[in-house]
Amino acid sequence: MKRLPAVAGSFYESDPKKLKMQIEWSFRHNIGPRDIPKQTYEKKKRDNLFFVVPHAGYIYSGPVAAHSYYYLVSEGRPDVVIILGPNHTGLGSYVSAWPKGEWETPLGSVKIDEEILMQLVKESEVIDLDEKSHLYEHSIEVQLPFLQYFFDDDFKIVPIVIMMQTPEIAEFLADAIYNVMQKNPDKDIVVLASSDMNHYDPHEITVKKDVEAIEKIQQLDYKGLYEVVEGKDVTLCGYGPIMVNLILAKKFGKKAYILKHATSGDTSGPKDSVVGYLAARFGS
């Protein structure tokens, strides 16, 4: 079963050569890390297990996303990347995993880790196997070219989209991921929470709203983050995935480190209506 790219040519370049140049542009951008990370091939225990990455078009959020990937790549190639994204389309079930096969992008194909996936399904009791949720969803797809640029096809993924973004669902998923990671100590597993921040307010308002959410992220306060999103009109689209990583970070004794916060007004667009972007890592 192959999942074909839905947003190649719109969110990112469809030509492989141009796409690689776009990824390099993201790293070298003045909002980005300004350098391309050197990949280590030395196998050692990973410190940064969990990340927040944005998922807009690369010209807008690529430089911010590059900060998270800089840290991920610097610690070497993971065996498995669990990618949690919000469900923008409204299709499919409340929590949906792509069941098997591979995902294709202009840079090639990446296989699903079916063994880890089925362990998660068994542990969580809330994950459905459902392709429909993923067919047109961009929040996971846009992460793959960044990973493929450095690791080619030498890693596997578990793609999960979350429509019901509640603290209770986040707890179920975090418990399942934690248990699976504990049962597979020899597998190098990383979890990406794919999310943009506040949407379509002027730059100054977006920054103010985002800061309220970022404070909760720094405190690993997943219920507080939920309250900010629900109670203060912060239109953060992937708060469910972020809540999962906040719970996981606390379980593993990690701290939150904000790598970069910017808006589309900082990267490529006007500042009268912007989207906020955050790169964060959770490590020692």
UniProtKB/Swiss-Prot annotation:
Disulfide bonds: none annotated. CDD domains: MEMO_like. Pfam families: Memo. It comes from the Archaea. Gene3D superfamilies: LigB-like. InterPro entries: MEMO1_fam (IPR002737). HAMAP family: MEMO1. Belongs to the MEMO1 family. This is MEMO1 family protein YN1551_0739. It comes from Saccharolobus islandicus (strain Y.N.15.51 / Yellowstone #2).
